[in-house]
């Protein structure tokens, strides 16, 4: 496709996108009746043996796809703590898509590395988290929790004399993983992915708002990880961090904060008391595609000790020479990844 045709196609995409956004306040929030069926029927065909016209592909995408979307980008959608996208972030993502960068390393994209490093620094500043913490921008809180708890797993087992990176988990000491009775389902998924299992966690009793009760906490021995919530998904309540973290420190436990939406309370002078003590944890996971209204997907993982994060997620290869700058593939679950900073 020549440059003029490309410009025309991008202009048409921008026009269709603007029309979609302008219509959000007038359309129903859920997909339009019958839209999903019409979309499925429109693309029910074998894999094409020849090329398709780009303009026609775009038209099909919009004409059949847009009515089958949920209006979560609009102001009348209140489901699942789903954010929209501010105009500036939508425009920035459009440009970033045109760049088509692999944000794996500084060498593959200096711009992506610098933007991500700056964005994470700002997040630490506004949330009052340790400036020396290492972090990555992942797909969402699930993978942010994964990155943080991978660091936690490897660190607590290393302190027990077990090298997970070299030996795996077979034969390793069994860490105690402590959560509240109303732990978020995605965190249990992460614990399963990391080899802890969903059913062998220690579940602490909670109050009527889903907060972990700080009285009568059990004694622990050996490697341990405590997961607390900054914002219960059903009530918005915060676990009592000062008491729980104090208990965890007496047992040499790693403390992780699942703060997908609630951790941002720390950025508000009015709401910051809710997040009191959360900055004393060892790792934090949150989302940018909720309160910050950046386009999906964008989760944030931060770990107090950079060596713990790198120790769990680093990669080596003859063609992967360290740049001396931010190489995201050394501290993120993914290697190939889009620019999210």
Briefly describe each language-model feature range.
Residues 1-132:
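N-terminal entrance/gating region of PLP-dependent enzymes' catalytic architecture
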Residues 82-96, 102-221:
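PLP-dependent aspartate aminotransferase-fold enzymes
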Residues 147-150, 189-192, 237-240, 265-271, ...:
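Short acidic, glycine/serine/threonine-rich loops at helix termini
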Residues 183, 232, 261-263, 290:
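Active-site-proximal loop/turn and secondary-structure-junction residues that shape catalytic pockets
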Residues 211-256:
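Active-site phosphate-binding strand-loop segment of PLP-dependent enzymes
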Residues 216, 238-250, 262-281:
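Active-site pre-lysine segment of PLP-dependent enzymes
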Residues 232, 276-341:
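Active-site C-terminal subdomain of aminotransferase-like
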